[in-house]
A protein has these predicted regions:
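Conserved AdoMet/S-adenosylmethionine-binding subsite of the radical SAM
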Residues: 46, 57-208
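Conserved Radical SAM active-site core
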Residues: 1-97
Length: 208
């Protein structure tokens, strides 16, 4: 078989899965879809909106994408974009500064070249223009020492921010194997630890 690298949700980007993707004509179609989901779960509090991928910043310059972001921010939702922060973006609108960017920068074990993984210009722009954005690194037991060297290099010459370490794994068993050493590494270097609760509960089930 073919080994899938670089993206842990390759069904979101691999054309092999295109028949499972859903297209929308405009941002209001997405809003209506989300509203239906909220009605079904009978959730009465204001929800946090998380845009993930794939890579959402591929659509940063798309007006419908910006309309979607603006819609939820204007309604006082907390809006998070999960990104690897490798693409160039500019902050041209004030509402964009209210986005929380969860920046999962890839390390060398993703097998992608450095120039495609680390964009310090984008990291700096995001951290200078937003208040709560943070960096997150997903690592396993076999990459701990190398990961710290790479993380410390990434943190050089960018604004200070929170840093989270997350255990690698697409099953509860894999998370169990990696979590203890990743926790200890976070404690040692003053980082925060983020677990993968959805994987502990549902393993790698899609749509949760």
């Amino acid at each position: 078989g073919v080994k899938k690298c670089a993206c842990d949700s390759y069904y979101a980007v691999d054309m092999e899965f295109k028949n499972s993707w859903k297209s929308y004509e405009n941002y209001l179609d997405i809003v209506n879809e989300v509203d239906k989901l909220l009605e079904n779960c009978n959730y009465k509090n204001r929800v946090d909106i998380v845009i993930t991928g794939g890579e959402p910043l591929l659509y940063w310059n798309n007006q419908e994408f910006q309309n979607l972001i603006k819609h939820y921010i204007n309604k006082n939702h907390k809006l998070t974009i999960e990104t690897n922060a490798s693409l160039n973006i500019d902050f041209q609108e004030e509402y964009q500064k209210n986005i929380l960017f969860s920046m999962s920068v890839k390390l060398s074990n993703s097998l992608e070249p450095l120039k495609k993984r680390v964009n310090k210009s984008t990291l700096t722009k995001i951290l200078e223009n937003t208040k709560e954005s943070y960096l997150k690194f997903v690592i396993g037991n076999d990459f701990l020492e190398n990961a710290i060297v790479e993380i410390e290099d990434i943190l050089k010459n960018i604004p200070q921010c929170e840093v989270y370490l997350m255990p690698l794994g697409d099953s509860s068993e894999a998370i169990d194997i990696n979590s203890e050493k990743v926790v200890n590494l976070a404690i040692k270097y003053g980082f925060k630890y983020s677990d993968r609760l959805h994987i502990r509960i549902w393993n790698n089930k899609r749509g949760v």
